[in-house]
Every structure is written in structure tokens, then in C-alpha cells.
Amino acid sequence: CRMWINSALATLSLDYLERVQYRSVCGGFLRQTGEPFILNLKDERLNRLAAGMVTEANERDLLLAFAIGSTSVSNTITLVRYGMLIGNAVGQHARVRAAKLALMIASESGHDPAGATAYSDSFFPEPDGFEVLANAGLSLIFASSGSIKDALVREAAAKYRAGFYTLPDAVCRGFFGH
């Protein structure tokens, strides 16, 4: 096992995360600060639906999936099982496509996604993305809430054995409102 150390990280502070960054785009610029949000499973705003099948291992996997998925390109679904990344579908135009791609990556790499945990970096705009993951046997699925169809996604989630955890989009989505 090899471990790389980045000595520049030793001088970082929380002030660094609050530093404003500017980036030019055609016709203007983007203004953005760092994203200091860290998922806390004890957060009172965390909504747990159908959490009966969720294990401590699933919740540990969720923390890893969050760390990977929240720092990946937008429109990501990340799969973790037994503390190991098994699928990371990034930059997809549709959440359901990201779900299918993450499962395909896991399968083509020789991993069984049954019992795994999924992190979605935003809400499911339709139930189909959740259903794809639940039908693959995932034990825990996390997504933000904030879609106009959240109720339909919750109804779909209630039909499956997978746990479904959500936090408001404005709380846990680093690029909320982009």
C-alpha cells in the first residue's frame, strides 16, 4: 500500500473554503465559494425513509460514497460496498442514466451491487433512477430533496426494501442553484 502526502494541504484552514473564486464564461463570469458541507448522519434534517434494512456498514459506506460523489463532476451517482468504490457515474444528463451507468460499471468490474449504498449528488427528478438502483438490490440510497416530484419518488421508495435518506437540496448540494 502506498500513501501520497500533499504538503500543501497542511497549511489549509476553513478560511480557504470560504475564499471566493471567479471563473470566466462566455458572456460573463461565475462567482463561487468552496463547499464546506460534510454529511453528518446525526443531522436533524436527515429524512430516513424505509430505513429498516440499513446497517451500520451501509451508513459507513454512505459517508465514503458522499466524499467521492460530492467531489466528482456534477450529475453523479456513486456506489460503495464494503468500504470500496464499485461504481462512479459522473457528468450524466439524466439521473436514471447515471444510475444505470453506475450499476454497469460495478458489474463490468466484477462487483455485485446487491447490498451496496448509493449516493446521488442531487434529487431524483423522477422515480425511475431510484427504482433502477432499488431493483439492483441496493440497501441504502441517498439523494437530496427538492424536486417537484419528491412525493412520487418517496412513494416509489416505500415499495422497496432499500433505505432512502434525503437532505434538502439547498443544504447538501454544493452547487445548489447553478
Model-predicted regions and their roles:
Residues 1-178:
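ATP-dependent carboxylate/acyl-activation modules
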